[in-house]
Design a protein with these regions (language model features):
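N-terminal capping/small domains of soluble enzymes
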Residues: 1-97, 102-104
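Active-site metal-binding loops of divalent metal-dependent hydrolases
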Residues: 22-23, 244-246
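Alpha-helical scaffold segments in soluble metabolic enzymes
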Residues: 32, 80, 111, 150, ...
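Short acidic/polar active-site loop segments enriched in Thr and Asp
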Residues: 39-40, 45, 95, 122-125, ...
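Short gly/pro/ser/thr-enriched loop/turn and capping motifs at secondary-structure boundaries
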Residues: 48-53, 132-134, 196-199, 270-272
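C-terminal helical cap(s) of enzyme catalytic domains, especially alpha/beta-barrels
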Residues: 55-64, 200-214, 256, 268-293
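Alpha/beta enzyme core
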Residues: 91, 104-241, 247-265
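A short, charged, Gly/Pro-tolerant segment at domain boundaries
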Residues: 297-305
Length: 305
C-alpha cells in the first residue's frame, strides 16, 4: 500500500493534489460531478475586498498546448465569499480549504486576509502577489523583492494561519523574490502563476483578448514550472507548492522530485472537469510504476540523485 499523504505547513493532506485558484470556482460547482473530498484540498477563486466584474470580453482564448486568459480577478468580494460561498462549500467539503487572496494595496491584502483568517474552514492563505500595486505606479507586487516582502510581512503580522505566497514567473530572478518572502515570514511558496502572453486575430488584425495580453497556462508552461520549482526549492527552506501545466499523475511526481511538497492543477480543470479526480486515482499506479512507496520520500529527490 503506497502512502500519498503529505503535510503542508503543519496541516495534513490525504494527497498532494490541489485544484488551483480560478479553475475550480468555490468547489461546490464540481461537487455536483464527484466527491471533492478525494482531493488534498483546493484553492478557491481569488478574493478581493470589493466585488470585481473582471475584464471585458473576450477574455479567454485557446492556444497550442494551453489557454490564454485575462479574466481580471472576477469575484463577489470578501463579504459575499464569507456570507454565501463558504457556507455552500461547507455542505460538500469537509476539509480545510485554501483561500486565495488578491489585492491592489497593502491595506487591501491585510484586510481580506484578516477576514478570511477568521473563517474556521480556511486552513491556508494563498497570497497572490501578481496584482498591480496602485500606489506603486502599477508595478506588480510580485516583481520586486521589497514589495513582495512588504506584502508578506504585513499579512503575517495580521493573521494566525499559514501564509503561502504565490509567485509570478514574469520576473528576472524568481529566487530573489522567494527568498524575500521567506525572510519576511512566509510559511510557504506557490509557483508558478501564469506566463504573460498574447495572440492576434488575423482577420481583425488585433489581439484576441480585449485586454490585449493575458496569462498563459496549460502544458506549454510545464517545463518552466519544473525549472522554477527546482530553483526555489534550492533557495528556500520553507515548503514549495508547484503548479503550471500539470495534466497527469506523472506531472505531479515530476514537480515533487523538483521540490514541491504539494501540486496545484489549473488549466486541466477547464479541459476536463474530472481531471483532478483522475490524477488522484492514478497516483498510486504511477507511484508503483516508479517504485515510490511514500511521496514524502521523493520531495526534492532529484536534487540528490
Amino acid at each position: 500500500m503506497v502512502k500519498t499523504n503529505v503535510t503542508l505547513c503543519s496541516l495534513p493532506l490525504d494527497n498532494p493534489v490541489i485544484p488551483a485558484s480560478g479553475t475550480f470556482g468555490y468547489g461546490y460547482e464540481f461537487a455536483e460531478l464527484y466527491d471533492i473530498n478525494c482531493l488534498g484540498t483546493f484553492s478557491f477563486k481569488g478574493t478581493t475586498r470589493e466585488p470585481r466584474l473582471g475584464n471585458p470580453q473576450p477574455r479567454i482564448a485557446e492556444m497550442q498546448s494551453g489557454v490564454l486568459n485575462a479574466v481580471g480577478l472576477q469575484n463577489p468580494g470578501v463579504d459575499a465569499v464569507i456570507a454565501e460561498e463558504l457556507p455552500r462549500l461547507a455542505r460538500v467539503f469537509h476539509k480545510p480549504v485554501m483561500a486565495n487572496v488578491s489585492g491592489f494595496s497593502l491595506d487591501e491584502y491585510v484586510e481580506v486576509c484578516r477576514r478570511l483568517d477568521a473563517c474556521p474552514q480556511v486552513g491556508w492563505l494563498e497570497v497572490n502577489i501578481s496584482c498591480p500595486n496602485v500606489h506603486g505606479g502599477g508595478m506588480s507586487f510580485g516583481t520586486d523583492p521589497k514589495a513582495a516582502a512588504a506584502v508578506t510581512r504585513a499579512v503575517k503580522d495580521a493573521v494566525k494561519k499559514p501564509v503561502i505566497v504565490k509567485l509570478s514567473p514574469n520576473v528576472t530572478s524568481i529566487t530573489d523574490i522567494a527568498r524575500a518572502c521567506e525572510d519576511a515570514g512566509a510559511d510557504g511558496i506557490s509557483l508558478i502563476n501564469t506566463v504573460m502572453g498574447m495572440r492576434l486575430d488575423l482577420k481583425a488584425r488585433k489581439p484576441l483578448l480585449a485586454n490585449g495580453t493575458g496569462g498563459m497556462s496549460g502544458p506549454a508552461i510545464f517545463p518552466l514550472a519544473v525549472r522554477m520549482v527546482w530553483q526555489v526549492y534550492e533557495a528556500v527552506r520553507i515548503p514549495v507548492v508547484g503548479l503550471g501545466g500539470v495534466m497527469s499523475a506523472e506531472d505531479v511526481i515530476e514537480l515533487m522530485l523538483a521540490g514541491a511538497t504539494a501540486v496545484e492543477v489549473g488549466a486541466a480543470n477547464l479541459v476536463d472537469p474530472f481531471a483532478c479526480r483522475r490524477i488522484v486515482e492514478d497516483l498510486p499506479r504511477v507511484m508503483q510504476k516508479y517504485n515510490i512507496n511514500d511521496l514524502n520520500d521523493i520531495i526534492g529527490g532529484a536534487h540528490h540523485g
